[in-house]
C-alpha cells in the first residue's frame, strides 16, 4: 500500500487535521469544478457573439446551451462516469477524461461553423460530467471526518474561481469580440492539459480499493433505489435539481439576457456575473469552509439563512422591472445565499449519504438529472425571457422555495461523522 493510500485510510481517525497531501489532492480534484463552471460561463459570455457570427436563431442558442456542460451533455457524462467510477475506480476515469475535455474545448475555440460549435460543446459537457462525480467522490473518501465539509467546500471555491477567471478574461478581451471569446476557450484548453498532467501522480482512493474487494449485495445498483439509499437519492435530487435551474440560469444566461433585453452592454453583463462569483468565493471561504463541519445545528442555520436570501434574490424579478440595479440586487443576494445553501452542501451530502461503491453512481445520477432538466429549461428560456424576465423570475423563485424547504426540513445529521459511522447509522435507521 502506498503512503497516499494509507493516508486516505487513516483520514477517519485524523479528526479535523488536513495534511498537505490532502490539500494537494483537493486542488487537483477541485479543478474538475473549475473547468466545469469555467466552460459553462465561457459559453455564456460568448453566446451572443457566436449567435451573431453564425447567424443562430433563439432556438439554436437554446439548443446549444441545452447540449453542453450546463445541461444534457454533462448529464450523459455524469450518468456514465459516476457509474464507471464505482465499477472501475476513481483513477481510471479522471486519468483520461480531461483529454477528451481539452479536445472539445479546442473544437469550440476554433469553430468556424455551427457543427463545430455544437460538437465541441457536447463533447465538453460529456467529459466534465464524467469527471465531477468521480473527483468529488475521491475528495469525500480521503477527507478527515471533521474536515470533509471544508475540503469539499474548497471544490466549490474552485467552481467559483473558474468563472471569475473566465469572466475577467472576457471583460479584458471584449474589444476583440469573437476573437476574445476564442482566447478564453484556449485558456481552458491549457488548464485542462496542465491539470491532466499533474493528476497522473494521484493514488487510487483507499476506501474504493477496500470496498471493491467485496461483493456485498448492498453495493449492487438496485440497492440505490430502495430503503435509506432511495430516501437519500430523493433528498439530494430535489435539493439540487431545483437549485441548479436557478444557478444555471444565472451562470450561462445573465450576460446574454442583459444584452438581449437592452438592460446593459455585453461588458456590463460579464462584469455583473463576475461579481456574483467573487462573492461566492468570499462567502464559501470565510463562512462555509469554516463552519460546515462544526455541528448539525450550525448547518441548519447556514442553510436556512442562505435559502431565504436566494428566494428573495429571484423574487425581486417578480415585483421590480428588469434593470441593472435589480440585477445587482439579485447577484449579491444569490451570491451570498447559494454559498450557504447550494451546491456545496449538495456535494457534501452526496459523499456522506451513500456507501463507497454507490457514491459516484448516486451523485452521477442526481447530477445528471439536474443537468438534463436544466437543459430542457435552457432550451425554452431565450424564448421565455424574450419579452421580459417576470415569468422566468417567478418560476425560479418557486424552484428555490422547494429546494430550500427540502434541505432545511429533511437535512441529515452527518456533520463530523466518519463515512463508516454514517453508513452504519443509516443501515439501522
What is each PLM-predicted segment?
Residues 76-112:
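Conserved MFS/SLC helix-loop-helix module at the cytosolic interface between two early adjacent transmembrane helices
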Residues 78-89, 285-297:
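Helix-to-loop junctions at the C-terminal end of transmembrane segments
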Amino acid at each position: 500500500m502506498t503512503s497516499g493510500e494509507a493516508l486516505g485510510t487513516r483520514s477517519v481517525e485524523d479528526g479535523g487535521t488536513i495534511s498537505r497531501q490532502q490539500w494537494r489532492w483537493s486542488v487537483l480534484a477541485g479543478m474538475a469544478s473549475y473547468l466545469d463552471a469555467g466552460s459553462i460561463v465561457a459559453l455564456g459570455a460568448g453566446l451572443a457573439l457566436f449567435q451573431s457570427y453564425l447567424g443562430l436563431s433563439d432556438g439554436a442558442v437554446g439548443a446549444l446551451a441545452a447540449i453542453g456542460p450546463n445541461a444534457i451533455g454533462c448529464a450523459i457524462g455524469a450518468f456514465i462516469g459516476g457509474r464507471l467510477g464505482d465499477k472501475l475506480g476513481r483513477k481510471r476515469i479522471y486519468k483520461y477524461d480531461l483529454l477528451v475535455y481539452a479536445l472539445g474545448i479546442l473544437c469550440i475555440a476554433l469553430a468556424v461553423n455551427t457543427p463545430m460549435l455544437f460538437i465541441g460543446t457536447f463533447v465538453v459537457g460529456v467529459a466534465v460530467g464524467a469527471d465531477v462525480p468521480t473527483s468529488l467522490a475521491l475528495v469525500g473518501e480521503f477527507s478527515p471526518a471533521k474536515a470533509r465539509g471544508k475540503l469539499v467546500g474548497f471544490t466549490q471555491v474552485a467552481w467559483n474561481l473558474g468563472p471569475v477567471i473566465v469572466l475577467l478574461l472576457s471583460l479584458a478581451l471584449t474589444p476583440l469580440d469573437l476573437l476574445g471569446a476564442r482566447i478564453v476557450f484556449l485558456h481552458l484548453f491549457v488548464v485542462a492539459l496542465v491539470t491532466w498532467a499533474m493528476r497522473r501522480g494521484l493514488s487510487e482512493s483507499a476506501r474504493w480499493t477496500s470496498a471493491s474487494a467485496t461483493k456485498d449485495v448492498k453495493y449492487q445498483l438496485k440497492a440505490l433505489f430502495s430503503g435509506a439509499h432511495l430516501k437519500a437519492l430523493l433528498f439530494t435530487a430535489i435539493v439540487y435539481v431545483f437549485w441548479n435551474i436557478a444557478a444555471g440560469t444565472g451562470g450561462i444566461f445573465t450576460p446574454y439576457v442583459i444584452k438581449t433585453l437592452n438592460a446593459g452592454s455585453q461588458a456590463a453583463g460579464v462584469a455583473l456575473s463576475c461579481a456574483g462569483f467573487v462573492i461566492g468565493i468570499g462567502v464559501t471561504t470565510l463562512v462555509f469552509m469554516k463552519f460546515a463541519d462544526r455541528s448539525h445545528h450550525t448547518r441548519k442555520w447556514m442553510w436556512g439563512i442562505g435559502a431565504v436570501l436566494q428566494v428573495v434574490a429571484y423574487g425581486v424579478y417578480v415585483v421590480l422591472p428588469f434593470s441593472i440595479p435589480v440585477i445587482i440586487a439579485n447577484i449579491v443576494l444569490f451570491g451570498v445565499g447559494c454559498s450557504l445553501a447550494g451546491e456545496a452542501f449538495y456535494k457534501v451530502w452526496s459523499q456522506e449519504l451513500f456507501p463507497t461503491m454507490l457514491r459516484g453512481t448516486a451523485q452521477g445520477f442526481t447530477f445528471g438529472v439536474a443537468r438534463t432538466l436544466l437543459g430542457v429549461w435552457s432550451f425554452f428560456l431565450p424564448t421565455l425571457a424574450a419579452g421580459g424576465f417576470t415569468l422566468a423570475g417567478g418560476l425560479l423563485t418557486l424552484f428555490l422555495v422547494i429546494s430550500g424547504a427540502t434541505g432545511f426540513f429533511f437535512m441529515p445529521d452527518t456533520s463530523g461523522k466518519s463515512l463508516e459511522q454514517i453508513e452504519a447509522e443509516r443501515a439501522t435507521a
